[in-house]
Amino acid sequence: MGRRARGRRFQQPPQPEGEEDASDGGRKRGQAGWEGGYPEIVKENKLFEHYYQELKIVPEGEWDQFMESLREPLPATLRITGYKSHAKEILHCLKNKYFKELEDLEVDGQKVEVPQPLSWYPEELAWHTNLSRKILRKSPLLAKFHQFLVSETESGNISRQEAVSMIPPLLLNVEPHHKILDMCAAPGSKTTQLIEMLHADMSVPFPEGFVIANDVDNKRCYLLVHQAKRLSSPCIMVVNHDASSIPRLTVDVDGRKEILFYDRILCDVPCSGDGTMRKNIDVWKKWTTLNSLQLHGLQLRIATRGAEQLAEGGRMVYSTCSLNPVEDEAVIAALLEKSEGALELADVSAELPGLKWMPGVSQWKVMTRDGQWFADWHEVPQGRHTQIRPTMFPPTDLEKLQAMHLERCLRILPHHQNTGGFFVAVLVKKAPMPWNKRQPKVQNKSAEAREPRVSSHVAATEGNPSDQSELESQMITGAGDSETAHNTENTESNEKKDGVCGPPPSKKMKLFGFKEDPFVFIPEDDPLFPPIEKFYALDPSFPRMNLLTRTTEGKKRQLYMVSKELRNVLLNNSEKMKVINTGIKVWCRNNSGEEFDCAFRLAQEGIYTLYPFINSRIITVSMEDVKTLLTQENPFFRKLSSEAYSQVKDLAKGSVVLKYEPDSANPDTLQCPIVLCGWRGKASIRTFVPKNERLHYLRMMGLEVLGEKKKEGVILTNENAASPEQPGDEDAKQTAQDPCVPDSVPGCDAAAAEPSR
């Protein structure tokens, strides 16, 4: 039977126009298709209400407010990237232009609430409004504001993030020297906050600390990479492991192998998500207590694994978007009991003034899906022991329970500050975990040589933290056969010799997910680097050993850079970790680079990291020069100011740095520095800046972008456009062939732009 015949065989008979389909909730089908859309989800769940009323986590007299807030849509929130020097300028632009335009504005009969700052977030860098994402996307009255949000989000200057999810990174108290592990990082909004805190001092291109962001889902790891890339940090590594058995890493310290313990750990575990009902309305019809019972064990294993890898004196934040004590206090109580005093709950009540929260509870009951309650483990019948575990109940020893101080946990209720529901607990490590006390902190070289390496697949499938600890204990004490030790020793020596961090040469179990390109550090004697060093007059302090590529064969097209600390992690753990991405792009090969003195041009992604080390080919430009460079495709030298022209005319062709320094004596001008990558051609100059970043700089300088569609090109006047007879055309042709050239700026012209400041 042919394909068409098969299709006709199973076709439904035609339905008369306007006839109702009972299977689709009474919707009618007309000529234009289904009318009325899908039936709305009823925001009711009797089991949910019965469960939480019985637990009494909502204060007396507030239940109706609590339920009413859950049925309301979640307000939109945004956070300004705090570490960037442009944060104040973005805040100024938001408050004095976009927010003012929202005053007295109505959309679909609803008055638009002017965004207000979150009272508990520092420096007014987080704001919320009653505008939902749907209204922002659909309303033409808000098109300009929506375009601003999308563009600035892509540039990494703004993050649209739920208010309560901003809390855990703030409570970690991150400092630039901290080594941080984000155990369940995707989609990455909290990870970006952690990166911001590492780069609090913009004058330091390479902080001593770093963030290792992990997620068990291989596909979500790439979403995580996209989020992290917006911040252009050399101190972030994305890895793909099961958080409950994430491998313990080692680093080289003065020739010795030391176990890597983290100063800060974010443990934002998978949960039932009943605190997200305001945005995930599916939870209303799918919620049962079975979700929490099934997740409790995984949550406890992840938290235990995090506690094992936390340094003494370090801080770990455990968080969920669930209000259920089985996922919250029960996990914390079980972890504290297992730690035997090694962990304690920190009192963070004064750390976020303005935040409203409820203290953790010390008594709760467990309910099954069919509504049966149990107050104690001994009440649970034998047939339910696999579903309900002892760790789901509060400790029976009242003295031990009081010593845990579960009231120090924070539970955020939706109706208190118009947010989602959330739970946070901050743990401090006072001593090694009881089962880790016998493990030596430092491994010598002979012990390391005997250490059997574990493939990432084995580590990712190990489910029990205690078993994992036992395995690591054997690894550290040197258990393993001599053949494995011999192979490991050879592998390590090869790693140090060629700097390749990729799959081991010996046959290993196949990893799941996509195969990643290797991370190959460039040897210090590589002939590729001296021309770069000479062309840009790099400072002697430039850490050239931190440069890497993603290929072992052929020409190196792109050079990336990581911090010294992440290089140490990569070189010593290549067989333990499945690394998805790390490093930022700092140089790209030119298509015809051999014609110039240097085959590599600068990449905008890494320019703020590289700039402190560059001593040549820097052109200081004015604000008007920046406007010209960002709104015209290939402006001739004569379009620049006399100061900039005098600098550029004597330079050889090739990549340049364009630097704008703010004038403090003129407060009406842009008050933050700008560093751009450019190309000095034969008679013209251009910038290599991505589209959204261009739009960002233009807005900060008071120019309004007029076009909205991506297909609208740069509006160039006749005097700006280079004709085929003009000398600038050769440069335009050269840059047009370069795959790294960014998109044009849509609908933006310096002459037509209207001031917004």
From Swiss-Prot:
Binding residue positions for S-adenosyl-L-methionine: C184, A185, A186, P187, G188, S189, K190, D215, D242, D268
Tissue: Ubiquitously expressed at low level. Up-regulated in tumors. Dynamically expressed during morphogenesis and in adult skin: in adult skin, expression is up-regulated in the bulge and hair germ as soon as the hair follicle enters its growing phase (anagen). During anagen, expressed at highest level in cells of the hair germ that give rise to the hair matrix.
Modified residues (Phosphothreonine): T717
Enzyme class (EC, first level): transferase
Polar residues composition bias: residue spans: 463-476
Entry keyword Zinc: no
Record-level GO BP terms: cell division; hair follicle maturation; in utero embryonic development; meiotic cell cycle checkpoint signaling; mRNA processing; regulation of mRNA export from nucleus; regulation of stem cell differentiation; spermatid development
Molecular functions per Gene Ontology: mRNA (cytidine-5-)-methyltransferase activity; tRNA (cytidine-5-)-methyltransferase activity; tRNA binding
Active site: C321 (nucleophile)
Region (Disordered): 1-35, 436-504, 716-757
Keywords on record: Acetylation, Cell cycle, Cell division, Cytoplasm, Cytoskeleton, Differentiation, Isopeptide bond, Methyltransferase, Mitochondrion, Mitosis, Nucleus, Phosphoprotein, RNA-binding, S-adenosyl-L-methionine, Secreted, Spermatogenesis, Transferase, tRNA processing, tRNA-binding, Ubl conjugation
InterPro entries reported in the protein's UniProt record: MeTrfase_RsmB-F_NOP2_cat, MeTrfase_RsmB-F_NOP2_dom, RCMT, RCMT_NCL1, SAM-dependent_MTases_sf
The enzyme's E.C. designation: 2.1.1.-, 2.1.1.203
Family in the record: Belongs to the class I-like SAM-binding methyltransferase superfamily. RsmB/NOP family. TRM4 subfamily.
The protein's name in its UniProt record: RNA cytosine C(5)-methyltransferase NSUN2
Species lineage: Eukaryota, Metazoa, Chordata, Craniata, Vertebrata
